[in-house]
Amino acid sequence: MYPLRSKVTTVGRQASGARALWRATGSKESDFGKPIVAIANSFTQFVPGHVHLKNVGDIVADAVREAGGVPKEFNTIAVDDGIAMGHSGMLYSLPSREIISDSIEYMVNAHTADALVCISNCDKITPGMLNAALRLNIPTIFVSGGPMEAGKAVVVDGVAHAPTDLITAITASASDAVSDEGLTRVEESACPTCGSCSGMFTANSMNCLTEALGLALPGNGTTLATHSARRDLFEQAGRTIVDLCRRYYGEEDDAVLPRSIATKEAFSNAMALDMAMGGSTNTILHTLAAAQEGEVDFTLEDINEISYRVPCLSKVAPNGTYHIEDVHRAGGIPAILGELRRAGHLNLKVHTALYDNAEEWLDDWDIRGGKATEAALELFHAAPGGVRTTEPFSQSNRWDELDTDAANGCIHDAERAFSSDGGLVVLRGNLAPNGAIVKAAGVEEELWTFTGPARVVESQEEAVSIILKKEVQPGDVIVIRYEGPAGGPGMQEMLHPTSFLKGSGLGKACALITDGRFSGGTSGLSIGHISPEAAHGGLIGLVENGDPITINIRERQLTLDVDEEVLERRRATEEQREKPWTPKERNRPVTKALRAYANMATSADRGAVRVVDGYVN
């Protein structure tokens, strides 16, 4: 039997002071000696994906208590990337991932909690909590707030928008063809309920990947925030974490620990899922970071190999017209994993927090496999309510029938894949010797090869300005540099430039490349994560207006077509500047908090994690 971590604060004479304080929080004599379960909630009124989580911690806590544990809840910060988008607020988004990880480590270790329930949902919160779970390596279960319902169809200025979402609204705002009145109609329809934004954007992608890793319950990635079935997941999470405590502390079963579950094979499966569902490019950034926290040897090269062999089986917004509620109706994450299993693209030598082996897990939950349980069939019938609300669990609508059409439905089988390659592709070349990422699932195939002159800017704001001023020409390659993890700092998302390009009618006529990153809502020929970034001496820092740039997704190449001698002269000139490898003209205040992140941040090929040197243990 392993001793409870919390024993140091609950047992013996020396723990008397700590016990006195525990009693002041509501703990009783009978609680001492039971596992203390930390519930990391992320409720905030700033974020629709988290606005409904205020009382959810109580649901989990009640289940923990009934199962024999002692629940103690605390909160993390949560940044809404959509509200922070397009202005200096976006500088704080990616660094907030590290703050979330650190804050959970601080709370759990300072109070010697025995286990952890992560109530996450949106863009940086799930990755931040995942990093913390792998860092702490105590029994952990994830349960997210759930996705938002898709917006209702609207007809604006004679053009149908069906169904709507956040990206519909942002794109419409840049279109001269949409009136102010029409824009308001789109805006009012786009985000109708609480929950993470309704497409296969970063938040939903990461919640789906956490399910595939085995650290979340089946259905976690796709069950709507508004549906009563989501409440069942929270209750089950509370019961499950106490059982994991029993197995680990009582039976010395190390298999239930996060690092035993999230192995290299599990990371490979999660990334295979990502390729199959065309997830956000941010998932690569966060997966690389999580692997490092868990000391798993999983790199960009592994992701590149998976991308070559795993087909794209689904095109969900922004890559198509389906939304997460449609993925759920088609069987959710187990259905996609089931298709990969049948095609031989899944490693079955893994287990989950609930199941000892992958075969049993997928047999029970893959509705297309022929062995699914009644619980699985019931769960995936959960449908949207179609009513504007910020209340969770507020409806119990059901689909009349499930979508099991592997040829024309939301999830295809491997024989009828959208493409033989994965939805995310790693590019290399002299512009990105350490890699760059493109969401191939969101790029029209006629744009997979593209050559054009560079139009260089040194901030997202400048990019937005030249697009809205119509200074960008068809065929241009917009280069946004010094927006990487260190150069930004904070590696801003470029959703506004890509959305405004689309809204201006240039979405299929231009390319955009950056050492920054993109929102999960981005589609089109948008290449991010260029490594090394400009601030670290990357070649993107030497590009000049008019330089020809060639993109070849099929050949996985990103090339600056300029003679090496010319580039060496430019590099020598850059090195002689008073402040080399910094923007020449950019007025951007950088706070102490952001400087701290910038001084430790690695480039995107390493997950933009911090490297802390100089500490001697």
Swiss-Prot record:
Listed cofactors: [2Fe-2S] cluster; Mg(2+)
NCBIfam families in the cross-refs: ilvD, PRK12448.1
Protein name, as recorded: Dihydroxy-acid dehydratase
Sequence positions bearing N6-carboxylysine: 124
Alphabetical list of Gene3D superfamilies matching this protein: IlvD/EDD C-terminal domain-like (3.50.30.80)
Pfam families the UniProt entry points to: ILV_EDD_C, ILVD_EDD_N
Quaternary structure, from the entry: Homodimer.
Role according to the record: Functions in the biosynthesis of branched-chain amino acids. Catalyzes the dehydration of (2R,3R)-2,3-dihydroxy-3-methylpentanoate (2,3-dihydroxy-3-methylvalerate) into 2-oxo-3-methylpentanoate (2-oxo-3-methylvalerate) and of (2R)-2,3-dihydroxy-3-methylbutanoate (2,3-dihydroxyisovalerate) into 2-oxo-3-methylbutanoate (2-oxoisovalerate), the penultimate precursor to L-isoleucine and L-valine, respectively.
Co-factor binding details: Binds 1 [2Fe-2S] cluster per subunit. This cluster acts as a Lewis acid cofactor.
Species name: Corynebacterium aurimucosum (strain ATCC 700975 / DSM 44827 / CIP 107346 / CN-1)
Highest taxon above the source species: Bacteria
Family the entry assigns: Belongs to the IlvD/Edd family.
The keyword Transferase belongs to this UniProt entry's keyword annotation: no
Gene Ontology CC, one term: cytosol
Catalytic activity: (2R)-2,3-dihydroxy-3-methylbutanoate = 3-methyl-2-oxobutanoate + H2O; (2R,3R)-2,3-dihydroxy-3-methylpentanoate = (S)-3-methyl-2-oxopentanoate + H2O
GO biological process, any: isoleucine biosynthetic process
Keyword Cytoplasm annotated: no
Pathway noted in the entry: Amino-acid biosynthesis; L-isoleucine biosynthesis; L-isoleucine from 2-oxobutanoate: step 3/4; Amino-acid biosynthesis; L-valine biosynthesis; L-valine from pyruvate: step 3/4
Gene Ontology molecular function, alphabetical: 2 iron, 2 sulfur cluster binding; dihydroxy-acid dehydratase activity; magnesium ion binding
List of residues binding [2Fe-2S] cluster: 122, 197
